Amino acid sequence: SGWTTLSLTRDFKAPDKEPLSKEQLQKFLKATPAIQSDSPEIKAVSERTVGSETNPIKKAELLQSAVFELIDKDVNRNSNTALEVLERKAGDCTEHALLFNALARAAGIPSREVTGLMYTQAPSPQFYWHVWNEIYDGERWISVDPTWDEVFVDAGHLKIANEDTIKIANSFGKIKIEILS
């Protein structure tokens, strides 16, 4: 029940290369019951959005901007699948991340969901729980936040877990952060 102090410094050095096995790549490319990247509707939106672009980072930029524009920011709209998000066109960060995952995978970009904390000034300076994505560019994972229309997210994003939010559920409501400057 003591305090842990964590100092964060923004490091502009590119992350180290992280080779993925074929099995790992397949895991982050495959459709799931929630991430319906193999559905005709998801494929059509993905193909229309990326067009003839082949660079995975540029594809991700196009997709995350499309998700940002498509979804009305509404914390009271919960969807369980990417197709529901596409149909309702509303939601919070979880819906943005869910739809982005499906569109990215449909475009052949390995992607995963990330859970963590995000700093914001509104309504007052503090950290909020947040969900965003990472794409694999063939060498390393790169953060993408379709809720805020950001590729290479800023230092205000504190990643806590990849994909499995259940593993960190016990932390919800227990983390306290004091912003010193």
Name the predicted role of every residue range:
Residues 1-14:
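Intrinsically disordered, low-complexity N-terminal segments that are enriched in acidic
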Residues 10, 115-117, 148:
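A mature extracytoplasmic/lumenal domain signature
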Residues 15-25, 29, 33, 109, ...:
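Active-site rim recognition segments
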Residues 20-91, 99, 162-181:
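Secondary-structure boundary elements
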Residues 48-52, 89, 117-122, 131-132:
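Generic recognition of flexible, low-complexity loop/linker segments
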Residues 63, 90-117, 133-134:
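Cysteine-centered nucleophilic/redox motifs
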Residues 73, 79-80, 113-122:
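Catalytic cysteine-centered active-site loop
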